[in-house]
């Protein structure tokens, strides 16, 4: 297994510059990461720069709060795909989940899945803000809505992926969906812990450091 292909090389800071985007694109080409994950404003450029490579372009929808309307998330998804996005990481309506308005949460996800038109959709449930029951419910709603992945975190809510959350999410979705761990995965040890817990994709800005750690530890 090429572990670089488990990494979405990520740059989602609001002050990301073109120079920084160029850096992660070049790193993704060099290390053969699964994707670069960038804000929608950078999707078209990233897509142009990665044309003819195996590196996918991933973007975020309703990010980071999940509090835009379903119609906006749907339009944002279509626009991103028109600009070259191949994977979509969307944030759920967290408040609706906490209110118990589960139909709204599911409909919100379904709208993005439909707008994505067959592209991979990863659903960010923002674990740090949820109870255990809410985490389980969010995973169940994501599955019912036809998503492909559940994802732990935006990295903008004061906490990221934990081994416990990844295990819980994987136990909930089984082999029917995949789990993406993101937020705070900074080194090889974090990476290995998340994969062992059941994640099959890692979102990280530290992709290069992770792979360099992998390369330096190839003896065992």
From Swiss-Prot:
Pathway named in the protein's UniProt entry: Carbohydrate degradation; 2-deoxy-D-ribose 1-phosphate degradation; D-glyceraldehyde 3-phosphate and acetaldehyde from 2-deoxy-alpha-D-ribose 1-phosphate: step 2/2
GO molecular function: deoxyribose-phosphate aldolase activity
Source organism superkingdom: Bacteria
Subcellular localization, as worded in the UniProt entry: Cytoplasm
Catalytic activity: 2-deoxy-D-ribose 5-phosphate = D-glyceraldehyde 3-phosphate + acetaldehyde
Keywords: Cytoplasm, Lyase, Schiff base
Gene Ontology biological process terms, A to Z: 2-deoxyribose 1-phosphate catabolic process; carbohydrate catabolic process; deoxyribonucleotide catabolic process
InterPro entries according to UniProt: Aldolase_TIM, DeoC, DeoC/FbaB/LacD_aldolase, DeoC_typeI
One cellular component term from this protein's GO annotations in UniProt: cytoplasm
Listed EC numbers: 4.1.2.4
List of catalytic residues: 89 (proton donor/acceptor), 151 (schiff-base intermediate with acetaldehyde), 180 (proton donor/acceptor)
Primary role: Catalyzes a reversible aldol reaction between acetaldehyde and D-glyceraldehyde 3-phosphate to generate 2-deoxy-D-ribose 5-phosphate.
Family, similarity comment: Belongs to the DeoC/FbaB aldolase family. DeoC type 1 subfamily.
NCBIfam families: deoC
Protein name (database record): Deoxyribose-phosphate aldolase
Gene that encodes the chain: deoC
């Amino acid at each position: 297994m090429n572990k670089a292909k488990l990494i979405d090389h990520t740059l989602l800071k609001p002050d990301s510059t073109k120079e920084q985007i160029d850096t992660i694109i070049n790193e993704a080409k060099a290390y053969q990461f699964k994707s670069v994950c960038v804000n929608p404003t950078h999707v078209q450029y990233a897509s142009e720069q990665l044309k003819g490579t195996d590196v996918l372009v991933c973007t975020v929808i309703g990010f980071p709060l999940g509090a835009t309307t379903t119609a906006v998330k749907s339009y944002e998804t279509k626009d991103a795909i028109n600009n070259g996005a191949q994977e979509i990481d969307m944030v759920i309506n967290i408040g609706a989940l906490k209110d118990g308005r589960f139909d709204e949460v599911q409909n919100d996800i379904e709208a993005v899945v439909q707008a994505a038109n067959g592209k991979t959709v990863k659903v960010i449930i923002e674990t740090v803000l949820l109870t255990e029951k809410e985490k389980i419910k969010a995973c169940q709603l994501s599955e019912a809505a036809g998503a492909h992945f559940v994802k732990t975190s935006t990295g903008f809510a004061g906490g990221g992926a934990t081994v416990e959350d990844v295990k819980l999410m994987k136990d909930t979705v089984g082999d029917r969906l995949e789990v993406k761990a993101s937020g705070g995965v900074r080194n090889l040890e974090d990476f290995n812990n998340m994969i062992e817990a059941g994640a099959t994709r890692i979102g990280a800005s530290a992709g290069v450091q992770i792979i360099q750690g992998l390369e330096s530890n190839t003896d065992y």
